[in-house]
Amino acid sequence: MTKRIRQPIIAVLGHVDHGKCLLPDEKVILPEHGPITLKGLFDLAKETVVADNEKEIRKLGAKLTIVGEDGRLRVLESPYVWKVRHRGKMLRVKLKNWHSVSVTPEHPFLTTRGWVRADQLKPGDYVAVPRVIHGNESDERFVSFVYEKLKNDELIAKLRGEVLSKISSEFKGDRAYKVERNVFRWEDIERLNLWDEVERVAFTPRMHRSGKPLHYVKLPRSPEEWEAFFYFAGVMFGDGSQDKIANNDVEVYEELKKLSVLGVAVKRVERTTSYEIELTNGKNALLRLLRVLFEYPERQKAKSIRVPRILFIAPRKYVSRFLRGYFDADGHVSLKDARIEVTSASQEFLEDLSLLLLRFGIVSKIYRSDYTTLVISGRRNLDLFRRYIGFSVKNKAEALEKAIKKSRRSESYPIFEELKRLRLLFGFTRTELNSNVPFYGKYESEEAPSYETLMRILDAIEKGSINLDKKIAVLEGRIRDHNYIKAFEKDGLIKDGKLTELGRELLEVWRNREFDSSDVDYIRNLAENLVFIPVEDIEEFEYEGYVYDVTTETHNFVANGILVHNTTLLDRIRHTNVAGKEAGGITQHIGATEVPIDVVKQLAGPLIKLWKGEIKLPGLLFIDTPGHEAFTSLRARGGSLADLAVLVVDINEGFQPQTIESIEILRRYRTPFIVAANKIDRIKGWVIEEDEPFLVNIKKQDQRAIQELETKLWELIGKFYEMGFNANRFDRVQDFTRELAIVPISAKYGIGIPELLVLIAGLSQKYLEEKLKIEVEGPARGTILEVREEVGLGTTIDVIIYDGTLRKDDTIVVGGKDKAIVTKIRALLKPKPLDEIRDPRFRFDQVDEVTAAAGVKIAAPGLEEALAGSPVIAARSEEEIEKAKQEILSQIQSVVINTGKIGVIVKADTLGSLEALSKELQEKGIPIRKADVGNISKTDVMEALSVKEEEPKYGVVLGFNVKVNEDAEEVANAKGVPIFVGNIIYKLIEDYEAWVKEEEEKRKRELLKNVTFPGVIRLYPDERYVFRRSKPAIVGVEVLEGRIRPGVTLIKETGEKVGVIKSIKNKNDFVQEAKKGDAVAIAIEGAIVGRHIHPGETLYVDLSKNDVIILAKQLKDELEETDIKALKMTAKVKAKEDPFWRAV
């Protein structure tokens, strides 16, 4: 068979771009923390990962609102927050009647024409804003926040009466009054962890210790109490002054009467022209509680009110009551404009209020002048306001109903091109859609449809065209229909009586019915989750200082209520910006880019001559993985699909956790690699010449810059040495088989890219020639990079072919969920050179065959359950099909585990990453019950729950690079099943191991708290050591063996119970424990000296069988030699009555 050299497959790992940043004062909202500036977020993160003069990266682990690749908003953990020095231009992007955000020029925004850099935005562009921002819904987190706020020096708290007797021993001498009068400061409560026992509170300065408050207010506990308090807070923010409420509405008064549940009375007082509502019985305590929890201002309320953090940390059921109180007091319904409006002297308050309303999906508008006005308009927003907040004031509630009826439109969605694409895909002419949606034609060109209209359009399109067969016949020329021909000409399907390329493509799509409801789902998700607001102004300014950003898996997050994005080495090689055209996907998926050798020669220029000998490779095939996690998908027969890898390391940041993980994976797969030390342009004073070879560029640098580069390179070389690699700058490497080559580059400006390409090509040819020789005519073998829905094609697979030739009429065998899928290729689609499989700028080229190495998209029936990372084998006979099925099944079965035994549940995004994670767990001795590919489902959680009942530490789900389904999250929260997700394998396992350790310590602490330890004591024989004979008896004792604690029962030699130790005193101090050798006084409740106990008598701590079992099995390490002696002595006593104790 003919053999030839194929192009090498190059994987690019570890690129992280820190160039896209925001000003320090831009705000994000953390569900568990509320609004916080990026600088504040950075200060919150304490563990520094990397730091130098230019930047600092810290571990974060906080949750943020992001947009997933399906267009839906969700909460995701952000692993890092960082700051970088910036000197130069910044842009403030201001959205019309919304917020503004200041970013570096390269920071992208999601617009209706895809992701667009800030410096390419223009007024009138529509930018994405989230419809919803997630706040906290956990009652537990809310209550802990309240307790934190109550740590106030003026707090005086009264505890529940039944607790006082239990804690009296803690308050002796001059502190006994606290228990007697039931008055405690926050330090007392914190020390004894009594927050849950606080019943009533008041506030008085410490300097007035002699004074005491007249009235306390009940600390809210029940939903009813919190709702009454939050409504009152809302009214105060609207109509309140320092001690009264100016409000005429009787309904507000009726609502405020509900404060009686907190022990506060209200009365309505008629003044000359209006009514006032006054608080009595606990007014001062209630107002002070308001100031503490809601940061309510003491003076100049109008200008100084701000939205307090509690409104983002409290569950929505309480926040809605605050908002109702506020809008009842200050809101106005304008029937003329069909809108709700509220005006304030505090612009900042209303700006934050607009973000708070996003917790309910309400998108408002902000009009700024001397006073700021917030407006809620549009049918969808008004309807959500009515559903979640509403008015108690009758005339406002009635006006709202009328405003909703009058309001017919919600936000507009200017997605003209998408609508045309969907219409043609489903086989409609403009005229046909006009009958479903009047004046439809204008929505494709001049007028953006409202949300309601868009939903009607999508519903109509989704039903499909009833005359599709006739249209197919017209395009095929079998039928002549003048109206259709005219419509097709207008849509560009026919020109001069012939089918255009678009017409031919569409005909194929219609014939095969290659469209379904999933084609409209993405647009529907965008409309449900996002709103697009026009850019009003872009202001340019100079800035010197730190800029900030956070890392998320999806490379986007919400800042100042606006969606912002972080994205790429390959962009420079392609001379095209991927982020600019990612309108639909948002996250960067695995892509493949073919670089013909002519392009390499053009970019590398004269450097080729330095490489002695001709480069025979046809080109390079780059696989651009968004991180180490995707590399695990590139598996082929247990090894790596990649022939060579480029590990991108930021020369300024050095090694990151991802870098270490990437190196470990490369080592595991035995993949040769070279290092691209990126961002040399960030070295102070570096002279930049775009696309210049590094060896030319370095000659233009001054000595200081060269020295800094050398220092950073030596730091990298040292790190590689620690990991077992000899590394050096590429031009100093003597033997490429023994030394790791480091190429200093600037991906941003193209410096060093020529050397990188020459090195990749030269090393591949010199050292991998035998591996790259393929049988051209042999059946193809490949690996699935990604399974994805394509408009007009259905489910497709993006595949890297690494051996043989794949033909368009081949039968292929593909790895599926738990089976081998056999299917016939319907279409082979290959991107043009210098483009990406996943998102080509131009339409795919249909090809008859592809020869390795190549990236190809395969359209074929039955691919819905295909697995990323699994093999693809072409088979040309029944025998080959059977052989391929067996090979694929054995590969899947070697990775997918289902033992049914006690062990953890493991889920991963691809077969390769599942293999890597499972291997790591097994090496650490962590048993696996089930390992499978896919998101974490409710079934996974239920299976982990069944494990938890037998062995709690294994009753967990570990997920690598996967999402948690909503129902799975609900069940996990309800049943207490821990779910660990992450995108760094070793970090995921570390987190799990840390949890196991913490759980074991927690369990041990719980056992220690509840178990009774053995102890043997002897009363002193001298009567002088009998301090009281009864109620309680107080006697001096010596601990002979073991230990004693308050609360234990004592027994005699006969086994008879004599009483309970109430307290233990060692000299002048009450203690919680006395051990062997201690001489102490003990108070025994229930015993009388001379009747039940006698001087010189030996007594034993009474133990239950359960105590012994726990001590022997679970707390063996906690037992000292003296405890074991005491246990044996006690067992001897108890064995007289029960034979169980003889075995102890």
UniProtKB/Swiss-Prot annotation:
One of its GO terms (molecular function) is translation initiation factor activity. Keywords: Autocatalytic cleavage, Endonuclease, GTP-binding, Hydrolase, Initiation factor, Intron homing, Nuclease, Nucleotide-binding, Protein biosynthesis, Protein splicing. InterPro entries: EFTu-like_2 (IPR004161), EFTU-type (IPR029459), Hint_dom_C (IPR003586), Hint_dom_N (IPR003587), Hint_dom_sf (IPR036844), Homing_endonucl (IPR027434), INTEIN (IPR006142), Intein_C (IPR030934). This protein undergoes a protein self splicing that involves a post-translational excision of the intervening region (intein) followed by peptide ligation. Coiled coil: none annotated. One of its GO terms (cellular component) is cytoplasm. Pfam families: GTP_EFTU, GTP_EFTU_D2, GTP_EFTU_D4, IF-2, Intein_splicing, LAGLIDADG_3. It comes from the Archaea. The keyword Protein biosynthesis applies. Residues 232-362 form the DOD-type homing endonuclease domain. Residues 551-768 form the tr-type G domain. Belongs to the TRAFAC class translation factor GTPase superfamily. Classic translation factor GTPase family. IF-2 subfamily. The intein interrupts the GTP-binding site. HAMAP family: IF_2_A (MF_00100_A). This is Probable translation initiation factor IF-2. It comes from Thermococcus kodakarensis (strain ATCC BAA-918 / JCM 12380 / KOD1) (Pyrococcus kodakaraensis (strain KOD1)). The gene is infB.
